[in-house]
């Protein structure tokens, strides 16, 4: 199994656990809601999210004074939706738990806060 497939599998598992734990907001509106309430520790977009989605979520980050940056996942919208157990593709997710956010950041080799 390639390293990319291994990372994608682990990310899918982490996002699934975070959703079951109630620590994940799936979709654009839910993710922006976590920014408004300042509950988000990390926000990510699918690899194939549209330019419009990226632009709007980046604008929402700025508008709400968030210090978070938008991370890109190696998962497609379909893969992300499957990981969350939804029949629909999901382009944006926010994590509301520092532990899950840290674990995903480590898998993606992102700098820690």
Regions found by a protein language model. Give the residues of each.
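Mid-chain, well-packed structural core segment of small domains
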Residues: 59-89
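Short active-site oxyanion
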Residues: 21-22, 40-42, 65-70, 91
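C-terminal structural segments of small proteins and small subunits
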Residues: 81-111
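N-terminal first-folded block
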Residues: 7-45
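Short secondary-structure boundary segments
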Residues: 47, 73, 97
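Catalytic cores of RNA-modifying enzymes
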Residues: 1-9, 19, 99-102, 109
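Amphipathic alpha-helical interface surfaces
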Residues: 11, 27, 31, 39, ...
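N-terminal positively charged helical leader segments and presequences
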Residues: 36-64
């Amino acid at each position: 199994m390639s390293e990319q497939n291994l990372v994608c599998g682990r990310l899918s598992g982490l996002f699934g656990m975070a959703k079951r734990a109630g620590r994940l907001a799936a979709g654009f509106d839910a993710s922006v809601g976590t920014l408004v309430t300042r509950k988000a520790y990390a926000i990510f977009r699918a690899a194939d999210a549209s330019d419009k989605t990226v632009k709007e979520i980046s604008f929402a980050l700025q508008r709400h004074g968030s210090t978070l940056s938008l991370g890109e996942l190696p998962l497609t919208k379909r893969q992300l939706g499957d990981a969350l157990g939804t029949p629909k593709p999901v382009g944006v997710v926010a994590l509301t738990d520092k532990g899950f956010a840290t674990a995903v950041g480590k898998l993606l080799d992102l700098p820690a806060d």
